[in-house]
Design a protein with these regions (language model features):
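Flavin-dependent oxidoreductase catalytic cores
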Residues: 1-266
Length: 266
């Protein structure tokens, strides 16, 4: 199987969103992560790492500065107002993702996943609910996807052609005015060529019950999102979300909704 180490910070403290969050913003973190990957490899597992920048989901009380984002929208109701990033800062952060990805490969990870969902920084650019920019990073689907495209390009340049890149995204944001499945498929047209795997999640902080699945939601309820992406682009997809019954997991795979099943609580 594939073990995914999630939510690893690419820029500290600005991009941090948790006191126990792992980091890959410095070389000093490589040795211990290499110990982890080697231990898992010895047991026959492949290792993936998910790299992330919190954006407006960071808290000034912890990071010591105003959070940053695409625009001046909080990532959740009552949250802090971030400042919009300059073009130069956007370019710099994209390079931070690439540098973190290079460190990940040096630490022995087999797959690098870019987190582009769940109201984190890339999501804040992709979603029209948090991006009202009037420059080349806002407005159209292509423009809102531009920062994500820059990140993907930097990661690909860092890891080379043989390391798979996974993209985790909120395929259906499930909020008023947010990206629908159809909107997601549109902006993925500008990202697809360098993506090897799609990790198909859902929701924003404003629809947290779909992002961190409420227990009343049916097992495998998100699989329609994995199927939509798989049907459109013909690439492997990961179905996730309340998959508690092994039979449901088998059914999702058997009917071709997804190629892989992601389970975060066994």
């Amino acid at each position: 199987g594939l073990i995914m180490v999630e939510n690893v910070c690419v820029k500290y403290p600005e991009g941090s969103n948790g006191t126990t969050q792992l980091r890959l913003d410095k070389d000093c973190y490589i040795p211990r992560l290499f110990t982890l990957t080697e231990a898992c490899h010895r047991q026959g597992a492949l290792m993936g790492i998910q790299i992330n920048h919190a954006g407006a989901s960071a808290m000034s009380s912890r990071i010591g500065m105003q959070p940053v984002s695409a625009s001046r929208f909080p990532s959740k109701a009552g949250g802090e107002i971030p400042r919009g990033l300059s073009k130069e800062e956007i370019e710099s952060i994209a390079k931070d993702y690439g540098t973190a990805a290079k460190r990940a490969v040096n630490a022995g990870f087999d797959v690098v996943e870019i987190h582009a969902g769940h109201s984190y920084l890339i999501s804040q650019f992709l979603s029209p609910t948090t991006n009202d920019r009037t420059d080349e990073f806002g407005g159209s689907a292509k423009n809102r996807a531009r920062f994500c495209r820059m990140v993907i390009d930097e990661v690909r340049k860092a890891v080379g052609p043989r390391v798979p890149i996974s993209l985790r995204l909120s395929v259906d944001e499930l909020v008023e005015g947010g990206n629908t499945v159809e909107d997601c498929l549109e902006y993925l047209e500008y990202l697809n060529d360098e993506i090897d795997i799609y990790d198909t999640s859902a929701g924003l902080n404003a629809s947290i019950q779909y992002q961190i699945d409420a227990n009343y939601l049916e097992d495998g309820w998100r699989s329609y999102m994995a199927k939509a992406v798989r049907d459109k682009f013909g690439k492997p997809t990961i179905a996730i979300g309340n998959i508690r019954d092994p039979k449901i997991a088998d059914d999702i795979l058997a009917r071709g909704d997804a190629d892989l099943i992601g389970i975060g609580r066994g």
